[in-house]
Amino acid sequence: MKSELCSPKNQLGNCLKKIIPILLLLVLICGGCAQKDTRTVIEFASWGSKSEIDILKPILSDFEKENPEIKIDFMHIPQNYFQKIHLLFASNTAPDVIFINNLYLPIYANANLLEELTVNQNDFYPQALEALSWNGKLYAIPRDVSNLVVFYNKDLFDRKNITYPTSEWNFDDFLKTAQKLTDKNTFGVSFEEDPLFYLPYLMSNGGGILPSEIEKKGSQYGLNFYANLRKKYHVAPLKSESASATMAQMFLQQKLGMYISGRWMVPKLREEANFDWDVTQFPKGTNGSIVQLDASGWAIAKSSKHKEEAQKLVNYLASSKNSEKFATNGLIVPARKDASRSKYFLDGQKPVHSKIFLDIIE
């Protein structure tokens, strides 16, 4: 028997009457075949530069491939990060996993908003673990540990026949070097009014900025020394002399011989500096060379309904393999000991003395 479904003998109307029911049936059948996404969704919030996010996203993609039952809903918050995290906690919509630093962690931990975490402590620098703990309990697994060093323009030192600084230099050496570097076009050293940048001058002399510390002899000496870099010796720019540029910009413009900053400056210097540069430790005071150590890492919200999956993600992010990936762009000092000693951090790129960052921690 021959089919007459759409034979030339049929009229168009008759043909359509026969085809449409078949098409509708096929649509209903195919619609019922669609697979519902049953994966557990983990919300993960983080700040970060483009280069950081370019490293992070493939890691999250790999995690999903290795854990097909989990889907990551990534929230990149590049600006006003903690303001937005505050609002999410206040509205009971906090992400499962939160990238956090040691400055804000106590606020959330003290409010009982974070889950206590455990980790193999031998894998990480104790300073990073301590920075992300509150009342003796760990609330975030560290990604990085940060500290301040002295960046210096090697070409400028060479032109002025100045010996490169070493980790053994003291405050007198530091001042003399800044004076030698200073001329009508260049200042010897940077000056910033944020406590992060002047606290080392106090701490290295046995002082600090807490009310119980500020009247100490070491605190007063450190503050006076720092202020006199501008006022007395004029080896650091006055506010009016640096109004049109940041300290980082002045260093890149070779208007500063030395620049006190952290590892976060390395990618920018690698890309933009048209001169040779390196790093050394902050100079020694009466109590040695002491700078503040900070850390960032991943925390889990106590309100998370998927703590097991969130823990799996945090452990994955903090693994040796991924810690090495985070180190590749030069932005961070890994909090994992093995990653910090790997070729991915000590990679031979500038600064030549990257190990200085580790010496300060160890």
Model-assigned labels for residue ranges:
Residues 106-112, 128-165, 191-211, 293-300, ...:
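Periplasmic solute-binding protein
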Residues 76-84, 103, 169-175, 237-252:
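Short helix-initiation/N-cap motifs at beta->coil->alpha
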Residues 96-99, 257-262, 278:
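Paired acidic/hydrophobic, glycine-rich loop segments that form the ligand-binding mouth/hinge
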Residues 61, 66, 71, 228-233, ...:
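Extracytoplasmic/periplasmic substrate-recognition and gating elements
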Residues 328-362:
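Long, aromatic- and glycine/proline-rich binding clefts that accommodate carbohydrate-like moieties
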